[in-house]
């Protein structure tokens, strides 16, 4: 017998250890590992980790397999791995119905089980008896399956199993938005069964998606049918959310040692080296101990203070577990592997030494990794006094197979039997290394020869759609539909991918299908999806952002390819817009916004672009893999004909109808404006919302409070005849001039008569009028509706058409058929259709009011009448592109969203919702105000864009109150344009999508801005720096004279601090580390009272300082304050209190502190100082009041208009300085709190 080499002898030693400690427990039938000798439950996660040592040892044997004996051992170890992975696969395939159902519901009760019987692979607990939804476990299985397959093992045997694996990919691809129970199976750390978004689950899912992409599950023997496909955008969504969360684990766990498996082996899910370093350092500094690392702060599992008789904890008892949490040697194993992959030998040796000191030696001398170490019951008091001082004892399983397996892997790496590349054949560890710059390829295609020739005049040479053949160009929705066929399997009852939107990463590739090649245009350029695609300026802005995104996110083979089609609808007065020409020239130059680009034709980029094979569209199940699925063939044939054809627009002017002389002319002017609910006239934003929703539903037109100031005792719904003189509509502020400017109407068409309903209204002797818009209540006769239809045919003015259609919708309904006109109120013998009583026609077909609205919507899009576009889009139920995705993008980055106007109708969105529910929630919040409902959806999309590209804008903001943001935007326009609230609201709703996005950016960033032109729909937002205009919107700049006039007004800085506080309050922005500092204040007092809500000291027992749940509690209390500027003064008062606690001025702050009392005391001190120095406030709040002024003050109205009885001049004071708000807050704290010294000089250095 040949002698063994030293390495062979050493491997035999590890083989014996692996067999004795791990393989001896493997069930012979299923291949699964039971939890222990007395517990037959097999967890997916634990089982996968257990087999890693076996896999690693098999690869070590393969390298030295020079004898049959070694080759046999290698094969036995490999087949043990295959046995386990197939055992888990069979257990999950038995629950294939759950995989299918979960794609639709994403409910925890429809998820795959987290554990199975090790004896037969069947479920062991019911759906509702365990926290089964653990996305990290399924993701870990897929990740290791990919790595093992890449290493040469064949685990998947049939195409049915391939289909199931493909559907497991769909199961985890939305991990970034699905709360689960996480790596420790408990969700919220109180263990009450509340799932939450976990960074460890998202990271593992991201790693699995990237590992499975384009992987052939049959290895070298596979073909196109055995390849797994993943849409790159889904993995990137996980990456973006993961990066925004780290180093936080979840809402209730501010840090978790489980993240070590995400930033290192096996996931390598983070591409940012600095973020990896920061996360590791945070774990080591706060969770590392002598015996390993704590799982997370205040983890009560197996501590002596835990009550083992119940699964959950009371919230107040979490504080008991602080500093006595169990420490887990498992995490030293992770740290050894982490540093081994970093090639840091010194750190590997350090943690290996620490680990060996705490391992348990068995009777035969084998080192065992215990599950955890706990403080003994009798030493808990000493550990509280001096954390880390007491000797701990082993609790739980020993050996802990999960940890033992990773320990053996670490030893194999340390002794050189394995290279790190063998444990990571897919090279995931290289993700954080610097990558070469990406060159983005751009192709512009003309819709027809005429557009091509127009571009050629500008020295821009492109091809037409016909000329790029045989390459076919299709919109993104076609690609989305094709992917619904991926993973379908009739035998298993699997329906494939749920139809979802596809992102820019997916459309930036070419796709091959048999002998055809497809290029897809980006989703944002799809005009059929939503109106913002009709705004050329916004499309250019989005294009630049997407090109910049590709630069940072692209990691596929080949270069990204962006394909755009220039259509007739993009033309402006039959000319190509200058903005488009300028952008194309920038693209041609080779750089745009710092990104390297190449402009060319599709055939030029065939060899350099990424190409994906759509072979899954074959009829594989029917035995014809080379033949397209019949449904796919039909779909593609249809789409080739109609994908880029122009849609006809409804002709509102019935060509067959002869206009007849009307007995009287009616005007529905202002019908759309009556639905508006934006209120900006009150100086105190957030105080006066619209009328309560219930009232507004019963009565669609309710005069707002300011109407009571109107001197007229009678209010008309419609404009009167010229003889009777003008009368304000209910929503008018008496500014008819502005309304006429906004709605220019031909005087010939403005003559109108009072209809019967208006006559009825005029008889009522009431200043407030409730007017019903339900069809059952209408007093209109059909003849009058006929006259409205005739007016609709005659008028060329789209605004007037909109008012008429709004009135028809209110009185007749969207589906009112105009064919019925003229019959009901005529005698039967005269009930014959003729040219005078027929309805609106298009090509001989009678149309409904809905059809007329569609035509109006399309015309408004073409003419860029954005206020009308938004309103008609809302009436037609149009959806903003990616609304649910946009809200999800905000929520998963820990930003809650509220919709509706404060304070009455705000609805908070705290979890991702389906699109239908979201739209219903928004429309419930705004009632009949379709314009603002659509604007809310639009702003949500822009907010999501900003949080993806400029997340720093949202730092220290937990809740985005969209309704309040809309009010502030209108208020800012009112301030800048020096106009009243109604005019500002109209200007806001008439902003183009590009300028709306630009204005929102200025609000978020706090930058000063001005408006360079005031033409409707042509407002241009101009950034201002100091008193000079430094930056403008890239498109649509105003005239120089207007800008000069604006610059002159910017010099006056009065009101800047009030504006800043108002903006910060509306955006719920707070100082850095604000919430954790408030926690320290709450720890030293009995409570903090804010606007009637008390934050109890017990919150510090339930939550840690950095816990997101605590921040949300404070935020909820602050949101009780309706005025944003007053809210910011309360925040400043809280910051002064934090300074008191941080400098340890007093051991305790006493009882409940009424924070608002501090603010009002500061205001009183401010007014006293103002009287002494004869400051500005002596003109209002600081002057001696006469009787009338005292009465006004008693009724809550200050002369200066300050909110919440606080002088406007205090709001407009800088925080610092001797007359700064923080100085007065400090003095107020010293006076109000009993614990602060009252005597002696107070030196305050407030920053």
UniProtKB/Swiss-Prot annotation:
User: Its membrane topology, per UniProt?
Assistant: Lipid-anchor
Cite the post-translational modification comment: Although the final Cys may be farnesylated, the terminal tripeptide is probably not removed, and the C-terminus is not methylated.
Lipid-anchored residues (S-farnesyl cysteine) = 1244
Compartments reported by the entry: Cell membrane
For the keyword Cell membrane, the answer is: yes
Q: Where are residues bearing Phosphoserine located in the sequence?
A: 1030, 1033
Matching entries from InterPro entries are given as: 6-hairpin_glycosidase_sf, 6hp_glycosidase-like_sf, GH15-like, KPBA/B_C, PHK_A/B_su
Question: Out of the domains of life, which is the source?
Answer: Eukaryota
What processes in GO biological process is this protein linked to? glycogen metabolic process; positive regulation of glycogen catabolic process
- In Pfam terms, one family for this protein is Glyco_hydro_15
> Residues annotated as region Calmodulin-binding?
853-883, 1052-1089
Identify the GO cellular component terms for this protein: plasma membrane
Going by the UniProt record, its keywords in alphabetical order are: Calmodulin-binding, Carbohydrate metabolism, Cell membrane, Glycogen metabolism, Lipoprotein, Membrane, Phosphoprotein, Prenylation
Q: Name one GO molecular function term.
A: calmodulin binding
Disulfide bridges in this chain:
none
Instruction: Name the major location.
Output: membrane
Pathway, per record: Glycan biosynthesis; glycogen metabolism
Instruction: Please describe what this protein does.
Output: Phosphorylase b kinase catalyzes the phosphorylation of serine in certain substrates, including troponin I. The alpha chain may bind calmodulin.
Similarity remark: Belongs to the phosphorylase b kinase regulatory chain family.
The name on file for this protein is Probable phosphorylase b kinase regulatory subunit alpha
Tell me the organism.
Answer: Drosophila melanogaster
Which lineage is the organism of this entry classified under, starting from the top rank?
Eukaryota, Metazoa, Ecdysozoa, Arthropoda, Hexapoda
